[in-house]
Amino acid sequence: MRTSLIVLPLTTALLFAGCATNDLGDRRDLSKTEQGAIIGTVSGAALGAIINHRNRGKGALIGAVGGGLTGAGVGYYMDQQAKDLQKQLQPEIRRGEVTVEKRTSDNALLVSMTAATGFDTNSTVLKPGYTPTLDKIATVLNQYGKTTVTVIGHTDSVGTDAYNQTLSERRAQAVLDYFASRNVNPIRLEAYGRGESEPRADNATEAGRALNRRVELWILPVMAN
């Protein structure tokens, strides 16, 4: 099983990952339990890797965003960003396509979304009807420039490991290119492809596979120290 880190400093980084052969074709409302499973969190090791990777280029990043956040202002800044994301994405949240969560322990925001809303089965081309959602997210990201954006894409276990990994990476590139056209600062952005390696639910059922075909968009504050 292979996991890749894609660092793409000249493009943007929202990653949609999906099943190789079995994305949901019909949209349905997700239950509260299913939404909770989609929200989830990456493991401590994975989040630590994100932070460590960003810290290696922290000096250039702070300069590029005009200085880092400090003190109590960090929590307030991220709270406001979470509220604006929730406000902008209310239709998608009501349909069960997107969730937004604020983690108080590290001031991280997690935007989770179902893969089927962004791509058709086996496709790496964004659905035209989904670009308005991406526009909303890009608008908020541009309003809150003192953050980094790390996107982790996931698939279910249908298909080979290699196919699922490649599919997630190609879908990442499609969204990265879209966000680049929306002027999100490239130095803030990176993406990981996880393929099928981190399921949130049982791949033995269609409901579980639908939950595993997801995207986790992590937004972290740029700290001055």
Tell what function each PLM region has.
Residues 79-108:
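Amphipathic, membrane-active segments
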Residues 118-153, 180, 210-212, 217-220, ...:
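Periplasmic peptidoglycan-binding/anchoring modules of Gram-negative envelope and division proteins
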Residues 154-225:
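Periplasmic OmpA-like peptidoglycan-binding domain that tethers envelope proteins to the cell wall
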